[in-house]
Amino acid sequence: MNQDDRRKYLIKGLLKERPEYEDMQIPSDAGEQKMLLRSLMNIRMPREMDNAFLQIQDAYLSEENENKGIVTLADIREVQPDLYIWKGDITRLGVGAIVNAANSGMTGCYQPCHNCIDNCIHTYAGIQLRNYCNDMMIKQRHEEPTGQAKITPAFNLPCDHVIHTVGPIVQGKLTKKHERLLI
């Protein structure tokens, strides 16, 4: 099965879950298919998926990540001893962990093709990340507080882990309380 076949298989599998999309036609253009697949992954609520789907999704995302290019620590300039700064797509980093600017629900951004980092991380990690985060939040029984963090496996990302943290939501003027929440 090649990437085109995998992508179509995944789209069909996700469309089957949504009766309202039963008549939707899969576009012939690969770029449009990629956007449709990402959209379907983004709006999918956390729930189990069969192993055949997950294996094909994992193969698809692995190849997509390889095609984007994986950046290791050796590729990044050290600015001070043990301090490296990367400007770019963090879903390409093959490092110990990346940090996700998560929302308090911790299950990712549900807006189709939104380019926030939360959406990108959940897309390229695969649907297992949303399921894992959902299970974690069910056990926790409350939203994640600002300034706290949770660590998860990275699933299909080239890094080892994802650290999810919720930043303060500032509406109006920045206050001392907002500043304290950043520490």
Where are these regions (language model features)?
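Macrodomain-like recognition of ADP-ribose-binding/processing modules
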Residues: 1-183
